[in-house]
């Protein structure tokens, strides 16, 4: 096989690897109780180590009412980053009862800067960047979900 064909085949296989390696996620619904009323979201659940490592990496878009919930099982000092994440995100850090204890707005795509919770958190919810400001979500708001039961 000529060298050019080998290179094209290699490039194709290399491009396809992330698609093979991508995790699949379960889904649930959640509601954020804000001062202006309930805000509903359809979320994907990142529950395993592999799912949490992948998160929203490589996604080029996400519906406005969608997000991802990370469950760390017990309250811990949570650190996140945006490596290989194409879209800007808002992050909500929650305690075990679903109360928002910290918010990080508009995390920068592809950044490897560490985003840490100020307090130990059990859950992190990632939403499209700008959602927190648009809906008035803030520290102290309560999040409910069938997943929490």
List each language-model region with its residue ranges.
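Bacterial N-terminal signal peptides that target proteins for export
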Residues: 1-8
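Bacterial N-terminal signal peptides
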Residues: 8-18
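Compact, glycine-rich, soluble single-domain proteins
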Residues: 22-149
